[in-house]
Curated annotation (Swiss-Prot):
UniProt-annotated location(s): Secreted; Target cell membrane
Lineage start: Eukaryota, Metazoa, Ecdysozoa, Arthropoda, Hexapoda
Protein purpose: Antimicrobial peptide with activity against Gram-negative and Gram-positive bacteria, as well as against fungi. Has potent hemolytic activity against erythrocytes.
Modified residues (Leucine amide): 14
Name of the molecule in the record: Eumenine mastoparan-EM4
GO cellular-component term (any): other organism cell membrane
Summary of the tissues where the protein is detected: Expressed by the venom gland.
Amino acid sequence: FDLGMLVKKVLAGL
């Protein structure tokens, strides 16, 4: 699991 990918996905969702 890559936390960085999750962060980028969340930021993209914003």
